[in-house]
Amino acid sequence: MLIGCASLTIQLGKRTILKDISMGVEPGEIVTIIGPNGSGKTTLLRAMIGAVAPRSGRLIRAPGLTLGYAPQTLHIDETLPMTVQRFMSLPKLGTASDIDAALSQAGVPGLEKQQIMSLSGGQLQRVLLARALLGRPRLLLLDEATQGLDPRGVADFYRQITSVRDELGCAIIMVSHELHLVMRKTDRVICLNGHICCEGEPDIVSRSPEYLALFGIDNDDEAAIALHSHGRGRSHHGSLSRAG
């Protein structure tokens, strides 16, 4: 296991955001966390990178684990000129060759001299991915990495994520609202709503009562289930897990 939680509970002020979260991620997995707004998805990722302290429970990391993180939003002063290369060098200096390699892995080679504020939404998301790839992390954390993209852009981004996993051998944890693509492009789904409602392989989770209570189902969901590839499924995730 690369990273995991054991009975993790997080409070912000008097409000409990996450309660009794227990989960783990194995090398090479793509795990997608889904849930309604305010369900604690971003908070869980922030806990994994050490930005939020749990009230109780434990966060477990493999020794020497390296992380790459792409946040949900990017705040840059529009009046401040900044090239992609400069952005990717902060807060520590990345070499030109490392930056070039990361941009290529993210599917946007040759953007080093472009101004950050001139990028399209799709290009910016790829640059955030490239920045997270610097240092070749063993675990990649992506928070709503496809927000603002059109359906084709979302599909292209998911293909790139799979390519990154295959090339680097890293595990990937994604927060996403793209339910249809999640069911095709991930190994395991964790359905979160302040606690883990259910988790498992996408086709199993999508039929669970807990998932249906949150999201319902339509023909597009059924088509997505049919298109899901089982090639990278693991036997110990072959059944549905529910919160006790």
Curated annotation (Swiss-Prot):
Record GO biological process: response to zinc ion
EC number: 7.2.2.20
Class in the EC hierarchy, top level: translocase
Single GO MF annotation: ABC-type zinc transporter activity
Domain of life of the source: Bacteria
Main location: membrane
Membrane topology, record value: Peripheral membrane protein
Family annotation (Pfam families): ABC_tran (PF00005)
Keywords: ATP-binding, Cell inner membrane, Cell membrane, Ion transport, Membrane, Nucleotide-binding, Translocase, Transport, Zinc, Zinc transport
Protein name: Zinc import ATP-binding protein ZnuC 2
Organism in which the protein naturally occurs: Hahella chejuensis (strain KCTC 2396)
